[in-house]
């Protein structure tokens, strides 16, 4: 299994990275985990979008799904689409089709008639125990964020990757990540910020320290930190994580790949 980072900037694109988007290659499977602002362009440096087998969206904030509109245009209007093209499976929160249609609709008046089902085959993450995608298995667990949000686990031939999506401290993330080879985990802010807070606000994001604590509690083999906003220092968040997690840990970088 191989993870390629399309974008890793937290809460929106930054000057050197798109927002969240991750390509997982496992055997013949090509799976996207999120597709935030700017990440569709990055995807095309690594893969023909027609070769995708599925998309899994952790939640529906724009920095994790805005470029689904671009993927729709590519698949619906490309003049040289494959003759065997089928609807692309999208695993996402239940309201994804309505939310994605709202982002794509030409106007508010046309929202009610905007239909994406000719291009995307939506599957509600809450309704599936495990999804099989071209020889990989995808599982999901609810996590703690202001909107409906999921962490995602991808398994293939004994290798396992867990992606936190966006979450505050959450037992569900620990359980889903238990024993995983790699935890790709958000670390959005420092554990303390003088003058702002002495402890992170609950139910939104993880600090670097909290990301490390979740990795340690789950017993993962390796921690990859992501989703660092441009206004915080990723190196400082990584140092926090390393204080509480004694396994390999690093910050991901756009266009970098990691073997699992």
Task: Indicate residue ranges for each PLM-predicted region.
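Cap/insert and terminal regions of metallo-dependent hydrolase folds
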Residues: 169-258
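Binuclear metal-dependent hydrolase catalytic cores
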Residues: 1-162, 168, 175, 238-260
